[in-house]
Amino acid sequence: MTVRAALTLAVLAAGCRGSAAPPVPVSAGIPAAAPASLGFDSTRLAGAVGYLRAAADSGAFPGAVLAVGRHGRLALLAPVGVYAVSDRRPVQAGTIYDLASLTKVVALTTACMLLVDEGKLALDAPVQRYVPEFIGPLKDRVTIRHLLTHSAGLVADLPLYDSTRTRAAALHAVDTTTLLAPPGTTYRYSDLSAIVLMQVVERLAGEPLDRFLTRRVFGPLAMPSTRFLPPPGWRDRIAPTENDTIFRHRLLVGEVHDESAARLGGVSGNAGLFSNALDLSRLAALLLNGGAWDTLQLIRAETVAEFTRRQDIPVGSTRALGWDTPSDSGYSSAGSKLSRHSFGHTGYTGTSLWLDPERDQFIILLTNRVNPTRANTMILHVRSQVADLVVDALTHPEL
């Protein structure tokens, strides 16, 4: 499917469903361009789409949307498969997905960049300066930089959905959790780091995370399909995730899949954001362009550079600030061919976003691999293979 055809289908699909309250938004994405003009071999890009379609057919996920862009232009926008195992409608270019942990970078990290630019957030300040409730042995030594690099020493997660009943109780449990290691000494990917950091952002912003991001990022950048807590009127455009058998006991459609984020009311720093490939293409293009898009300078170029470089905390970690970078050896969701200066992230529901500033290229892959169950882990191979196929398709990087 061509980019023009995919965009047309998205508009027609939205229009045919009639009005809703609020209306279902139509995302524009970034301008499309012929793949060859951006250095891509169209046949090789088609091969990447063919691989993705075969992965859907083999059960890796019900459906997916792949978006590839370069130089601020969209070279490929390819929906494949269906909405869900139980919903055989074909995926559209504008289908909305639960981003899961892409929330950490698209939402939370972007918010931190804005607050750093404003001089409100200091990366090496102790977390307790902003959240005094963050208490326990050695926690006075935990900094914002530690939270962003997952080196604070916090546990990976807590069963908040089972052990607490309110948002306030959940936040208290997170803030008073004992560290497993001294700050800065070990890397442990932690949802708790993102939940603590969300509290920092909300206090500095003076408003809830979702409102701050809508006002400062998603609104100005024209990302109308990106938000927490999507309204019921959006339901038909959202790809279902899991048939939840442990907490909510229903098929999740438009409800955050992550249990901790659900206990926090659907708005959290670790998960909860919904979006589509078109909207995300705008943020990706902005980040590759030094924080600017069109006439909007959303983030200082120096801030983008700092947040997307490896911090080496602890020594040998691949983490940037919020973002990750490709592994030096072994498996990486980025594949094996993106440059070492690339940055990206994944989401548990089957989403990923990788950006390569050396090639000025991004790869967005949105799937709902947890439908109908999270036991399906075929996405791990698919992510890296798609990334490699897309890089191989860039046969003229000099353009």
Question: What annotation goes with each model-predicted range?
Answer:
Residues P25-A28, A84, P137-S342:
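Short, surface-exposed loop or secondary-structure junction motifs
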Residues M1-A6:
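Bacterial N-terminal signal peptides that target proteins for export
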Residues A36, A54-G69, S86-H146, A181-S193, ...:
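Short active-site loop at a secondary-structure junction
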Residues A36-L99, K120-A122, A168-H172, L251, ...:
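Short, conserved catalytic-motif segment at the N-terminal edge
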Residues S342, T349-F362:
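Short, surface-exposed beta-strand/loop micro-motifs that present aromatic residues
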Residues V65-A67, H146-L148, R227, L353-W354, ...:
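Structural recognition of the beta-strand scaffold that forms the well-ordered cores
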Residues V26-A36:
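Acidic/histidine-rich, surface-exposed loop or edge segments in extracytoplasmic proteins
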